[in-house]
Amino acid sequence: MSFIPHKLEQIKKMLDTIGASSVDQLFDEIPRHLRADTLKIKDGINEIQLANLMRKRANKNHHNINYIGAGAYSHHIPAAIWDIVARGEFYTAYTPYQAEASQGGLQVIYEFQTMMAGLTGMDASNASMYDGATALAESVLMAIRSNKKAKSQKVLIAEALHPTYLRVLETITKHQGIEFDIVNLDSKNGKTDVTKLEDFANTNYAAVVIQSPNFLGQLADVDGITNWAHKHGALVVAVTNPMSLAILKSPAEWGDNGADIVCGEGQPMGVPLASGGPYFGFMTCKMAHVRQMPGRIVGRTVDLDGNEGFCLTLQAREQHIRRAKATSNICTNQGLMVTAATIYMSLLGAEGLERVASISHENTQTLATELAKINGVSIRFNSAFFNEVVIDLPVNAETFVTEMEKEAIDAGYFLGEYHSDLANSIMVCATEIHTSEDIKEYIEATKKVLARIGG
């Protein structure tokens, strides 16, 4: 149906019906000074003129080299990935309830689940969550449901958990009677001191949350914390960067018995930064907990003719069947982002992922080492890290970051917002996209900025 503007008689009839004297009266709650009576739009232009105009405007953009990290990472995305993802079969797909008409999409999700289960060392994976923070919240709720032996709904969290993740976790669980205790980190190494866990030994916890690499980039003492948690009857929820698992041991190998649930942000694998989203969260677990897992799960089966097929499985957990008794009110998944991640992992393979992770670590190590050679600059913590490290500066870090932007460099994440003791600290992150020349430019820009602002 074509759009036909309303005639004056139709507008009058509408106003008379609702008892309004004019169209303006419909918007009287909007202050007059906020209304735009006319828009300053020029006359129409042709396609060539439009292309030239947009090209000129695009040239005004300045692309800084990004070293921020802190939960969102700049990695190279092979061109083939989004060329494939943008195909109509993927781009416009809907939840594959009708399995016989959705085998392609279902298989992609199944392959994703298989890869994520392999990467994390777990038995099962769901089809994804909204993002890393909501994946953690759902993992905590899942752990509480699964831990039938726990006598409380208390959860123990290491302080170096990503602060945004913690806020989302608190928001989602606010009215569910769940309590959180925080284990303070060691100021010398930026991670949880396992000996401090004994201060909580007399409290019954349903779950313990461990992030490694943690928010400050440090590798947690995952073995010690995991063993302590299991000894005291708690399930272990691991939060991790999937890229790090290409070179670090999987959560399944943490401690004597491994983590129970693994979650995190999948953005590093083929998903662009895109001003904060859309991203996707991943969640995997041991088979013992799979019936408490939220979200879609795709299974592989054989039909009556012996042909391999895929379908949504264990659907009795989900909202469209169990309604209020479902494991979660999430009734979707980030299918498009999952498709990108699946293609990314397929293209790179195990060796490619390991190479990306190794180069990211090496570049971060090089950047940190070179920065520490500058007078007044030092590496804050003396423990192992993956691809992020905290740097202490002789000046206010927020001022430093602002000045570095003038050098076309996003120098890092200002940590003063995270902790008052870190007002002169930034967290820097390097990945495989940063060249040796990029790192040299960062070092020279740092010297220049420190000289300019009195460092």
From Swiss-Prot:
Q: Name one GO molecular function term.
A: glycine dehydrogenase (decarboxylating) activity
Keyword Oxidoreductase included in the entry's annotation: yes
Q: What class of enzyme is it?
A: oxidoreductase
Q: Which residues cross the membrane?
A: none
The family database entries (SUPFAM superfamilies) matched by this protein are listed as: PLP-dependent transferases
Query: Quick one: which gene encodes this?
Result: gcvPA
Any Pfam family the entry gives: GDC-P
GO biological processes: glycine decarboxylation via glycine cleavage system; nucleoside metabolic process
Write the protein's name: Probable glycine dehydrogenase (decarboxylating) subunit 1
- What's its job? The glycine cleavage system catalyzes the degradation of glycine. The P protein binds the alpha-amino group of glycine through its pyridoxal phosphate cofactor; CO(2) is released and the remaining methylamine moiety is then transferred to the lipoamide cofactor of the H protein.
Please name the NCBIfam families in this protein's record: PRK00451.1
What keywords are assigned to this protein? Oxidoreductase
Q: Its quaternary structure?
A: The glycine cleavage system is composed of four proteins: P, T, L and H. In this organism, the P 'protein' is a heterodimer of two subunits.
Q: Which reaction does it catalyse?
A: N(6)-[(R)-lipoyl]-L-lysyl-[glycine-cleavage complex H protein] + glycine + H(+) = N(6)-[(R)-S(8)-aminomethyldihydrolipoyl]-L-lysyl-[glycine-cleavage complex H protein] + CO2
What's its EC? 1.4.4.2
Annotated family: Belongs to the GcvP family. N-terminal subunit subfamily.
